[in-house]
Amino acid sequence: MLIPRRVKHRKQHHPTRRGAASGGTRVTFGDYGIMAVEGGYVTNRQIESARIAITRHIRRGGKVWINIYPDRPLTKKPAETRMGSGKGSPEWWIANIKPGRVMFELSFPTEKIATEALTRAIHKLPVKCKIVRREGGE
């Protein structure tokens, strides 16, 4: 799973969800990609689950790129704890996704298998996504 080795601050504010993605909006490495249509948070477990869904479907034929990284900690207080007494402990790591961001890329010879693999990965993600192709017709 994707987890930062070390961070400057163990607990952070929640990232903002406003606005569209400014970078990472095109398919640059592979031939096909998963683009977010809406914004939200994606955890490290969801990223790993989507990666496994893609790699199991394509087997050995292609290559997968993950363009997002969960670098923000999300905290949670224990169950049945009274309010107050500080912020909870870091529970999981999230990546802030904005609309238009290409999250995964895939290069594979046949389009049918590539789109099926990316569709399986989309079902694992909590944000609405669509499959995009590399521009330029290569």
UniProtKB/Swiss-Prot annotation:
Region (Disordered): 1-24
Disulfide pattern: none
A GO MF term: tRNA binding
A Gene Ontology BP annotation from the UniProt entry: translation
Recorded superkingdom: Bacteria
Biased composition (Basic residues): 1-17
Keyword set, alphabetical order: Ribonucleoprotein, Ribosomal protein, RNA-binding, rRNA-binding, tRNA-binding
Entry-linked NCBIfam families: rplP_bact
Protein name as catalogued: Large ribosomal subunit protein uL16
Organism per entry: Kineococcus radiotolerans (strain ATCC BAA-149 / DSM 14245 / SRS30216)
